[in-house]
Amino acid sequence: MKKVLKIIGWTFLILILLGIGIGTYFYQTDPMIKAIVNNDESKLYYFPTKEMSNMDELNYSESVLTIEDSINIYTYQFEPKGEKNANIFLIHGAGGNVSTYKRLIKPLIENGFGVYALDWRGYGKSTGIPNYKGVMKDTEITFQDFLNKTAKDSLKTVVYGMSLGGPMAIKITKDNQNQVNALILDGTVESAQSLAIDYAPVKYLKEKAKKSPEKFNQDYVGVRDIADIDNTPKLIIHSRIDRDVPFIRGKNVFNAAKEPKEFWETKTDHIMTLIDLTDEAINKIMEQIR
């Protein structure tokens, strides 16, 4: 009996050590697992690229805002060739930079919208390293610049948030309700916590994220903040087959919002509405500002 117990004990110890070894290996070799364990937001949520692709086919101007002593934020103002219908403050998603989204911007300006877009710190030509407080500060300061530059137009203002830009679009709208005429969200993230839950590669990390909301950004939480927006029309777009941000995240944000609101269920890839459903998208945006 003692021999059997000894064998069981050694087997159990070997399994534990093996598990620790495997866990340590993946922790050291998989950046995403390491980021989730350490809650390293710069690697969990932001995937900037510095190289800008050519945007000469679009009519735009480039400006630089100094946010802090060492942080320069680049902004891009795209203008339609003909009459302008409204001005859009566009907050892009976690990957790339403004030029990555030129295919999404093009249908807007071709249909009479002026588009102002920014690259957060660390994205494109903008300097610095992204973090949740910093990118929100970049967004708030550039939104005021957007308002200053479009004030003379006397046109309606639309805040448009894509994916990770969704919670920031919600926060901007919440804090400027008298100056925003419509809020558009496409493939929006629900919260930083929901991202960690959705992308956790193992059950333990998923459960850890569920139980610890305080460990994630609480300064702006899309599903919470949208409930504080009163009379601003809201169009929430989410694809049933979105593989980047689960469909339920968009539904949760919609359910938390007050009227007036509209949920548009699509079947496109993540945030591809403006490309795959251009006419319907333009019509729905126009409906929000009529």
List the model feature ranges, each with a label.
Residues L104, G222, P246-N255:
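Short alpha-helix in the alpha/beta-hydrolase fold that links the catalytic acid
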